[in-house]
């Protein structure tokens, strides 16, 4: 018999793999419960500046060779719009994405009912 314990070794390997998967699953469940919490919705017209955004705003050189802070564009825009912004990291210098609400079109009345 060349390999008398192949099924026992396979069972042991499978058990170790299942244990590893179970521990990773428990870690993900533990981490997921804290990261999946959605923030409270903001009222339209209120700026949404998070701590992560203000810390994550980087200073990027502009085309003229000077330094332009994205925050200088973010503050006036966020205070005058009906939407809100999602902070992001971008290679193109876009530090936030605007999210505008979808408004339903105003129904237009057709020809008046004549009897």
Swiss-Prot record:
GO terms for biological process: DNA repair. InterPro entries: SOSSC (IPR031821). This is SOSS complex subunit C homolog. One of its GO terms (cellular component) is nucleoplasm. It comes from Drosophila grimshawi. It comes from the Eukaryota. Belongs to the SOSS-C family. Pfam families: SOSSC.
